[in-house]
Amino acid sequence: HGQKIQDKAADAGVTPKEYVDKIVATVKDLWKLLDVSYDRFIRTTDDYHMESCQKIFTKLYEQGDIYKGEYIGHYCKPCESFWTDSQLVDGKCPDCGREVYDAHEEAYFFKTSKYADRLLKLYEDNPQFIQPESRKNEMIAFIKQGLQDTCVSRTSVKWGIPVPFDPKHTMYVWVDALSNYISALGYGNETYHDYDKFWPADLHMVGKEILRFHTILWPAMLMALDLPLPKRVFGHGWLLMNGGKMSK
């Protein structure tokens, strides 16, 4: 889901679903080539996942952790990240160095700032929660500079899960994607029943460019939902080709 896929599909002259279906086919072929088997191929376009996400979003809204407002700032389409003026580096995305564009639209926000102190306490009480140490220090510095509430919906993006009580909005792709960790286990749906068996996760192994989502936004969401947190998050570096990050 998200604007990046929506725009790529439009450029290719196909629907977003048709566009991602082709990518899924190549990923499955890659697993065969690598002799990798799996119990279930999980996609965020699955109906059960949509059901779970809508329940999560509604619960957070009803308990006051999500509110409606207006987003005015910048957006990096490749990273799918929102940024303020002060966070940009030479006017560009601080994560990838690409151009950002101005964004101004009605949106819902998650009260990430409400959980800043709890997140810092989490890192202090559980020093192994974020690894390696250098990445943990980056996340602490990010929070201490002033944690902003997170824009969690878009009206300009149609390729996404609709907000159930305000369907002109679709959920921000990272709220959708992170929720997949527990929706695939059956949280918020009756399709699967593995949540108690497999959650919390022992480890999230993620690229360093998405560590912020996994160690700030995701734990804050879980705290708001009163759910257990993953035990550790490891932010690994990149495989490089010609001096640049290999695309995932």
PLM region spans:
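Structured secondary-structure scaffolds
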Residues: 40-43, 48-52, 78, 96, ...
